[in-house]
Structure formats: structure tokens, C-alpha cells
């Protein structure tokens, strides 16, 4: 049992060192963390009202958002549109909700429609 614990701790230390090295090389933390063991769990619990959800969708459904949170936001939008279709009819990044990008650094690939956003 002691030997197993030592193996586990060594592997975690090495993974953490590799993670820090990747970060030092400029790899975004949210991407570098994929080499960490599944034991380094990330949990997300949020409470939002409709206004906060609209803001979240505007930011996190943009193609410039990190892919993993974009996938979570897309599923949240699907469920929100099921429960409150009128409220969330135009939710999403500004390229969908307003017809043009409001980002300081646009991605150059705006969504053409809500359907395209939800199907991606």
C-alpha cells in the first residue's frame, strides 16, 4: 500500500511539473491541464438568472471562447431554449444575437445562424 501511494504521488508530481513547463512555454492553462491525471478533477456549479445566462451565452458561445466551455454553454443554451424559448430565442454571441461581431478581436468566422451555432 505504501509503495502504491509513493507511485501515485510521484506520477502526480511529474504531471504537475510537466503542466507548469507547458504553461511556461505559453500553452494556455485550460489546454495544458489535459495532461493532468483525472484525479485533478474540475467541477463547475453555477447559479444564474436569465440576464446572467444571456451574458454567459454571449461570451462563452463565441468561437473565440475555449472549446470546452463553449460545448458546455451550447448544451446549456439548448436546455434553456427548451424551457424558455421566448426568453432565449436570441441568446448567443453577438454575431447571432445582433448580426455582427462586437469582439475586440473577431474570430473572422461568425456564425450565420442560431441553427449553425447549435449544430456545431
Residue ranges of predicted features:
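A conserved ligand/cofactor-binding region detector
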Residues: 1-120
Amino acid at each position: 500500500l505504501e509503495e502504491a501511494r509513493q507511485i501515485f504521488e510521484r506520477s502526480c508530481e511529474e504531471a504537475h511539473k510537466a503542466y507548469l513547463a507547458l504553461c511556461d512555454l505559453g500553452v494556455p492553462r485550460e489546454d495544458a491541464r489535459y495532461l493532468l491525471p483525472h484525479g485533478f478533477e474540475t467541477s463547475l456549479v453555477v447559479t444564474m438568472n436569465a440576464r446572467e445566462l444571456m451574458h454567459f451565452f454571449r461570451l462563452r458561445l463565441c468561437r473565440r471562447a475555449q472549446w470546452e466551455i463553449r460545448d458546455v454553454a451550447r448544451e446549456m443554451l439548448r436546455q434553456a431554449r427548451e424551457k424558455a424559448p421566448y426568453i432565449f430565442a436570441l441568446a448567443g454571441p453577438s454575431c447571432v444575437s445582433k448580426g455582427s461581431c462586437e469582439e475586440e478581436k473577431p474570430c473572422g468566422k461568425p456564425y450565420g445562424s442560431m441553427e449553425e451555432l447549435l449544430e456545431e
